[in-house]
């Protein structure tokens, strides 16, 4: 990002970045954490945030740290098996951003429109969670970020409106947005 913005390069930062370990995986699926080898066998691990999708949805794609085929397989497992009723409002935008970066705009839109209680938006703009938690801003902010990314793209995206299906059914208009890093 610093190179793209023509800012000074800090060699010490690049050195640290190159030494970051690749994401932990097992059986060609990325794990929730290196200490959780049973991520996809322990229901507790796939009943909260599908946070592993943040590695490709929220951060710049880096092939040194992320194997695209492995991430795609992980994403497919998550779509098929996740306990969505226990997830949180920001999980849906995070899934949308990951799907968009992986060239799956139908899944990106599907994540934002998934019919789940915690993927509901109130008139106030807040993301409804449950009766005890009436205000929840991470879902709202995530939704705005996901839609902006789906419209303006990200560094390296080449198609207009890359997060929306290019099947002729979408007429997406926007202005003033910048690509995500």
Go through the PLM ranges and name each one:
Residues 13-43, 63-181:
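Non-catalytic carbohydrate-binding regions of carbohydrate-active enzymes
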Residues 48-49, 89:
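Start-of-helix signal in alpha-solenoid helical-repeat scaffolds, especially tetratricopeptide repeats
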Residues 52-58:
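Active-site cores of enzymes that catalyze phosphoryl transfer or operate on phosphate-rich substrates
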């Amino acid at each position: 990002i610093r190179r793209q913005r023509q800012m000074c390069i800090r060699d010490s930062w690049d050195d640290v970045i190159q030494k970051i370990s690749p994401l932990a995986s097992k059986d060609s699926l990325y794990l929730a954490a290196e200490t959780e080898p049973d991520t996809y066998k322990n229901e507790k691990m796939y009943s909260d945030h599908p946070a592993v999708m943040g590695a490709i949805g929220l951060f710049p794609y880096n092939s040194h740290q992320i194997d695209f085929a492995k991430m795609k397989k992980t994403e497919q497992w998550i779509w098929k098996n996740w306990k969505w009723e226990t997830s949180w409002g920001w999980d849906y935008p995070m899934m949308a951003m990951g799907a968009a970066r992986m060239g799956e705009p139908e899944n990106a839109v599907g994540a934002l429109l998934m019919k789940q209680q915690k993927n509901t938006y109130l008139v106030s703009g807040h993301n409804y969670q449950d009766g005890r938690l009436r205000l929840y801003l991470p879902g709202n902010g995530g939704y705005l970020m996901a839609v902006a990314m789906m419209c303006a793209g990200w560094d390296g995206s080449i198609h207009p409106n890359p997060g929306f299906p290019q099947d002729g059914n979408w007429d997406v208009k926007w202005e003033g947005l910048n690509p995500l890093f």
